[in-house]
Amino acid sequence: MTIMRKTHPLIKIINHSFIDLPTPSNISSWWNFGSLLGICLMVQITTGLFLAMHYTSDTATAFSSVTHICRDVNYGWLIRYLHANGASMFFICLFIHVGRGIYYGSYMLNETWNIGIILLLTTMATAFVGYVLPWGQMSFWGATVITNLLSAIPYIGTTLVEWIWGGFSVDKATLTRFFAFHFILPFIITAMVLVHLLFLHETGSNNPSGLNSDSDKIPFHPYYTFKDLLGILLLLMVLMILVLFFPDVLGDPDNYTPANPLNTPAHIXPXXYFLFAYAILRSIPNKLGGVLALLLSILILAAFPLLNSSKQHGLTYRPLTQIIYWIFIANLLILTWIGGQPVEYPFTTIGQIASISYFTIIIILMPIASMIENNILKLHA
């Protein structure tokens, strides 16, 4: 008798993806973040669904409905903070996942990488429209500032902004449509995740050595199911510590003040996970230039496969590029710090230097390091 999981049309797909999947025997914990992202997405959709049951997307009642969720709904405070801090954990896992992809050369799996970039952009869009929903001061002014950036687009900019707003300012129509977007996008993300996995399983996973691992594969279950389970437990533990002890540490105090179009907050700063991009945006004095730099800060990821000239897969045996990579990570952390600082000296100057460094490292330094390493290899061949 044949095993049902190998013959049943539906279960067979799950079997080939999570049970009998041939996996490299040496993939490290850096490969855990894919499954952690899946868990984050499920947590966000579940908590989001329960929040949507009590939330009202009307400017008059949105802020009050969030207060009502926290005060009157059974465990509403828990659901709300799980959703808010779950988003932060989601982005931390996302950035580590992308960072691992850059370090180990996973961008050479072109289709998987490109779908991943689209996923990153879609997730950022989802988080942005979600941040507007509580209708606090930072929600309102964040929405105003970021949507206003589109007015920098020549010729159609102003019309486009008013079209997105559904009026001449961020108002009731904007909030309603942002709620609609925030509800539908996670399901689109889920569909794209399946495509992401489909392309990944076409080629198989990369591994830390960067060598072909066809001769040394092990089944995904039980080895990596349990390894993933450990990662999930650690993720949930960190998330629960965050939610139960420091629920507001990543939030903004201004968002506990209801939205007021007549009063601008002293410093408009986005959520913790967008600060690096916000710093790049602010570092360019020209509006259109800033918007283009903001877009390029993410889209430049698509250039990695094109800029790669190394004879080796990944940075495991490439010490020079490793040094540049870690300088790049440090630079990214500096940008994150600058994004949360006021627009004044010396922060503006540091931001400009860090922004130039961000693009210089990717476009110039990494390819040069690859060429040097290739020449060293030739000398010792």
UniProtKB/Swiss-Prot annotation:
Major site of localization recorded for this protein: mitochondrion
GO CC, any one term: mitochondrial inner membrane
Subunit structure: The cytochrome bc1 complex contains 11 subunits: 3 respiratory subunits (MT-CYB, CYC1 and UQCRFS1), 2 core proteins (UQCRC1 and UQCRC2) and 6 low-molecular weight proteins (UQCRH/QCR6, UQCRB/QCR7, UQCRQ/QCR8, UQCR10/QCR9, UQCR11/QCR10 and a cleavage product of UQCRFS1). This cytochrome bc1 complex then forms a dimer.
GO BP annotation list: mitochondrial electron transport, ubiquinol to cytochrome c
Ranges that cross the membrane: 33-53, 77-98, 113-133, 178-198, 226-246, 288-308, 320-340, 347-367
Source organism (scientific name): Oecomys bicolor
Role this protein plays: Component of the ubiquinol-cytochrome c reductase complex (complex III or cytochrome b-c1 complex) that is part of the mitochondrial respiratory chain. The b-c1 complex mediates electron transfer from ubiquinol to cytochrome c. Contributes to the generation of a proton gradient across the mitochondrial membrane that is then used for ATP synthesis.
Note: Heme 1 (or BL or b562) is low-potential and absorbs at about 562 nm, and heme 2 (or BH or b566) is high-potential and absorbs at about 566 nm.
Subcellular location: Mitochondrion inner membrane
Gene3D superfamilies cross-referenced by the UniProt entry: Cytochrome Bc1 Complex, Chain C
Sequence positions that bind heme b b566: H97, H196
Domain of life: Eukaryota
Binding sites annotated in the UniProt record for a ubiquinone: H201
GO MF: metal ion binding; ubiquinol-cytochrome-c reductase activity
Keywords: Electron transport, Heme, Iron, Membrane, Metal-binding, Mitochondrion, Mitochondrion inner membrane, Respiratory chain, Transmembrane, Transmembrane helix, Transport, Ubiquinone
Taxonomic lineage: Eukaryota, Metazoa, Chordata, Craniata, Vertebrata
Family under the similarity heading: Belongs to the cytochrome b family.
Membrane topology field: Multi-pass membrane protein
Official protein name in the record: Cytochrome b
List of residues binding heme b b562: H83, H182
Obligatory cofactor(s): heme b
Cofactor binding, per record: Binds 2 heme b groups non-covalently.
Keyword Glycoprotein: no
